[in-house]
Amino acid sequence: SATLGTTTVTKTSDETTDTVKGIFPTPRPVVTGDYVFSSKLSGTPGLGFPEGTSFGYQWQRDGKNIAGATAAEYDLTASDVGHDLRLRVRASLAGYTTDYTYAKAVEVQPLHFTATPEPTIDGILRVGGRLTSVPGDWQPTAAFTYVWYRNGKAIKAATKAGYTLTSSDLGKAITVRVRATLPGYQAVSRLSPPSVKVQSGLTSASAKLSD
């Protein structure tokens, strides 16, 4: 007779070890400074991060990264005015899951002109006379646009600093609206006092129109 032998096979499963990464606290970054054009903002990650944590910074405008704005400090520009700005902080450390936290988004405000004088009109108040708008001494210096008015109604195509009176202006009062702009500043419009009524016939007399 034959005896059949038996073979014992022992299988050992592969041992796997899952490493659980640490999780950072998630405090909001802290930003100091005024959200006003030309101001400097400074950001810090907030408290509670483990020793040795490294941080990366990214400033965002309306939720989109601002090119090159990757330092803890940021100087506000004219492009930021009227938009929401926030700081994103990236925290990284060996053994931890990389984390992103965000400061509260805040709308950036413009600066304001410190002097906004009422414009005046120089020129000859007769049909055919040439009028010139004098914006005055704005601070800081601004760029100006103009609209001329006849009895309170805008004159078509009269949008330059100078205006030549026509027969349509006869017997009417003339005013000019000056709009001042400067990047990063709130635009301001000022209206001149109305002139006396325009007379007929060009003469050599001239007058400065003001209050």
Regions found by a protein language model. Give the residues of each.
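Ser/Thr/Pro/Gly-rich low-complexity disordered regions
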Residues: S1-D211
